[in-house]
């Protein structure tokens, strides 16, 4: 008697090839993957023009495994406004107002931690100055958006070419991304020493939140809002 061994069929659908997709486009089309991309430090904001393949190679990541991980994530319905004018309002309320409220407190807290723990080997020396730079540069940047660029975007139709002022904002976003790198380095990846006091822990938690917020802020502008006013960029 012959025995036939049934081989189970593979239930895995063919993975979409995301390797050549720019990170910014990936973040836009797969919002459920934003947390994964952030955890792997794949820059989909200012580095959004690089392909997933290039970014994975730079980080020493297995592209096929990365694509499987992305495919396994459940799609999420976007809760973001679809029209640029409404997206501007969302950015103003969710990010501009938040940065203005939180950054001065982080500067104050950094001053306290650096002063009280000046003799500690792991004190984040220079963090107050770095956060003050963030506050100063980001305040000037947001003022320009609020006084010049955003009113223009709310007056004209999507597809209108506003590439020159948008390009200036993109360039400033690149500067902000470098500040994020410096903040991560200054706080040892937001990890306080084991014996850190509550103020020190609160400082690092606040800096981590600010960095995460700024990444999302830049993503919304670079990958969702700005392209609506850069027709030549996609040509």
Protein language model regions, located:
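Small-residue-biased structural context
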Residues: 1-235
């Amino acid at each position: 008697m012959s025995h036939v061994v049934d081989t189970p069929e593979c239930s895995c659908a063919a993975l979409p090839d995301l390797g050549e997709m720019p990170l910014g486009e990936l973040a836009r089309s797969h919002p459920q993957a934003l947390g994964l991309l952030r955890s792997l430090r794949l820059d989909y904001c200012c580095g959004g023009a690089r392909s997933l393949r290039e970014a994975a190679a730079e980080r020493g990541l297995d592209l096929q495994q990365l694509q499987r991980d992305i495919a396994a994530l459940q799609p999420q319905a976007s809760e973001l406004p679809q029209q640029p004018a409404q997206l501007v309002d969302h950015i103003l309320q969710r990010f501009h107002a938040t940065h203005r409220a939180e950054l001065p407190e982080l500067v104050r807290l950094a001053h306290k931690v650096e002063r009280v723990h000046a003799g500690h080997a792991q004190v984040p020396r220079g963090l107050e100055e770095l956060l003050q730079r963030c506050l100063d540069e980001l305040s000037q940047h947001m003022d320009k958006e609020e006084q010049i660029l955003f009113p223009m975007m709310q007056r004209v139709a999507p597809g209108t070419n506003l590439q020159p002022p948008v390009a200036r904002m993109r360039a400033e976003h690149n500067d902000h991304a470098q500040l994020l790198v410096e903040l991560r380095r200054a706080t040892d990846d937001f990890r306080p020493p084991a014996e850190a006091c509550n103020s020190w822990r609160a400082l690092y938690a606040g800096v981590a939140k600010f960095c995460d917020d700024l990444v999302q802020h830049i993503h919304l502008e670079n990958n969702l809002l700005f392209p609506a006013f850069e027709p030549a960029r996609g040509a």
